[in-house]
Amino acid sequence: MAKKIAAKKVTKKRVKKNVDRGQAHIQSSFNNTIVTLTDAEGNALSWASAGGLGFRGSRKSTPYAAQMAAETAAKAALVHGLKTVEVMVKGPGSGREAAIRALQACGIEVTSIKDVTPVPHNGCRPPKRRRV
C-alpha cells in the first residue's frame, strides 16, 4: 500500500526591488501605446498598454488611453519605490505627451525626456499611402 504524497506547488516568490531611479520607455504607435518602467539597467519593473487595459479599436490610440496605461504602470512601479525616471519616447503616436503628464501626476519626478524614435537612413520602403 503506497501512500499518495500531495505534491506541493512550487511558486517563485515575487521579489520587491527597492529602486528609486529608473527609466520610463513610452512606445507610442499610431494604433497603441505601451509604457514600460525599468530600473537604471533596463530591467522591467512594470508595464501597461492601452490595449491591455481594455481599450479596443480606435480608442486604443487616444491620448486618454495612453494616460491610463501610464498611470497603471506608475502605480505598479511605485510599489518598488520608484521616485525619479528618465523618459525615453519612441514612435509617432498621439499618446506621447499624455503618458509623460500622467507619470508626473502619479508622483514620479521626470528628470529628462529623450526622443529615441528610430529614423531610417533610407532603409525599408514605407507602406503605401492610404486612400479613403
UniProtKB/Swiss-Prot annotation:
Taxonomic superkingdom: Bacteria
Q: Which Pfam families does the protein's record reference?
A: Ribosomal_S11 (PF00411)
Entry's Gene Ontology molecular function annotations? rRNA binding; structural constituent of ribosome
Example of a GO cellular component annotation carried by this entry: ribonucleoprotein complex
Query: Keywords, A to Z?
Result: Ribonucleoprotein, Ribosomal protein, RNA-binding, rRNA-binding
The record's section on SUPFAM superfamilies has: Translational machinery components (SSF53137)
Q: Does the keyword RNA-binding apply?
A: yes
Tell me, which GO biological process terms does this entry list?
translation
Tell me which InterPro entries the record gives: Ribosomal_uS11, Ribosomal_uS11_bac-type, Ribosomal_uS11_CS, Ribosomal_uS11_sf
User: What's this protein's family per the entry?
Assistant: Belongs to the universal ribosomal protein uS11 family.
What role does this protein play?
Located on the platform of the 30S subunit, it bridges several disparate RNA helices of the 16S rRNA. Forms part of the Shine-Dalgarno cleft in the 70S ribosome.
Q: Which PANTHER family match?
A: 40S RIBOSOMAL PROTEIN S14/30S RIBOSOMAL PROTEIN S11
Q: What is the annotated quaternary arrangement, including any partners? A: Part of the 30S ribosomal subunit. Interacts with proteins S7 and S18. Binds to IF-3.
Q: What is this protein called?
A: Small ribosomal subunit protein uS11
